[in-house]
Amino acid sequence: MSGNIYMDIIASQVSQGNFGGKNGQFGYLAKDKSRREKKLTKETKFEAPKKKVEEKFECNVFIGSGTAKSTDSNGLSDPFVIIWSVDAEGQPDKSLFKSKVCKKTLTPNWDEKGTLKLKESYKSLIVELWDHDLLTANDFIGRARINVDAINIKKYSYTFKDTISVYDGEISTPSGTVYIEITNSSSTKSFSSCA
């Protein structure tokens, strides 16, 4: 827009082919309008900031045997394991792995393998032990945290092996244990456990 309504009307009519079109006596108005619009477009062009590409890598996980406190009326539990990622703010991000349910036992043996897809921003992993219930909500048994330490191991494979004690809030007495192995052969992270 030039600010002069009459000039804008004439320029608009010239663009539509009236008054001899762009080659007619008022053709320069359409060309000026076109230049002004291009200039405005260049000046107001918005470029979104480029996102940093976050490194991602995979680790193999093995969930072995463990223990679980009794949560069912029959004196047993139906335990299963969930592994969660933890974001940069320390909050659970998403479920990375869920084991099968071992029915009616206090000494489960999952003997299960899987893959964890990790991101560079993950600071730790949470291992949770749950009791599966069919008719009611699952019962929480306990949780533990595995820290993801920034150690350069690009040239070496690394395996974290530990029987992790999980706690339901009372730090003094574990409510269960989970044997876990995390094998990392191609990334830049190693793992250590903490309660």
Curated annotation (Swiss-Prot):
Residue sites binding Ca(2+) 2 per the record: D72, D131, D133, D139
The keyword Cytoplasm is assigned to this record: no
Keywords assigned: Calcium, Metal-binding
Listed cofactors: Ca(2+)
Highest rank taxon of the organism: Eukaryota
Any GO MF annotation of the entry: metal ion binding
Domain C2: 38-161
Amino acids binding Ca(2+) 1: D72, D78, D131, D133
Protein name (record): C2 domain-containing protein DDB_G0290753
